[in-house]
Amino acid sequence: LEEALLIKEKHGGEVVACSLGKETASQILKDAMAKGADRSIFISDEKFENLDILSIGKIFVSALKNEKFDLILSGLQSDDQGNSQLGMILSELLNMSHASLAMETEILNDNAIKVKRELENGWFQWTELSLPSSISIQSGINTPRYATLKGIMMVKNKKTDTFNSQDLNAENITPLVNLENLYVPVKSKETRFIDGSTNEIIEKLTNVLKNEIK
């Protein structure tokens, strides 16, 4: 959000915040508008809960298809699933260029943007992308601003478009991935002494490693 607001301050345009979740998630959009987003899109339906990331991407595309955007900026990962894939999936479904782990952006002209990407071991890469583009922003790219009292008061005058499964023709959507079980592995410790000759110890230890340790 902060990167989008900075781009708007330099180059103009409109910032539209978008989120998918339960009714409580609508507060996130109110906070975004209080900080400077011009309007918001809220996608919410019980049928959208527990969907896989590809299906979620398709839902976003259905909600955004009528938007005339130049940039889609997404975070590093969501708090619930943490897939780190939505930005890439949106770029594929919308036939847009994409960059991940973005640490800095620079609008070059109406048709191109330059992105500084974080690589491993302290390395960075500058890459030029055509617009429109989907860019996944790395954590720590900037310091998010606080909402001002004026910004909070202006939220009531800003528009939020809300979509459910019927609005998006997604009443029959089903997960492509089913989560059968989610659990914390049981940790246990055991000490065992193996006696015998060298050959016997090797044979017993080999049997333990092959058949008992998982």
Which sequence ranges carry the predicted segments?
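N-terminal glycine-rich FAD/FM-binding segment characteristic of electron-transfer flavoproteins
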Residues: 1-214
